[in-house]
Amino acid sequence: ITLLCGATGPGLELLQTDGSWLAGDTLPEQIVVDTGDMLQALTNGIFKSTTHRVVNFDRASTRRFALPFFMHPRPTFDLTPLPRCVERTGGRPKFPVQTAQRYLQQRLQEIGLA
């Protein structure tokens, strides 16, 4: 889970399933909760992992600051899809049995950081 809070200006965009970007601007006192890959695996896809970006359209005259807060489960946490979520999504797990540490290591390798 990522909490996106305290942005000083517009620019938050969310990737939609058709590949287009949707403006996700908020008021200063609002928080955006961004679900990630681990929560998607744990819920067998009930909660979808989201992709976001931040663009600064008026880079010449303003700066945009934000304070993201990332939360990860402990390394030994079991990310096996929850049985109730598997039941609600057709009865078959869509994600492998793995720990949070194993998932994070694989992801970091995929993006060239491990």
Model-flagged regions — what are they?
Residues 1-114:
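C-terminal flanking tails of non-heme Fe-dependent oxygenases
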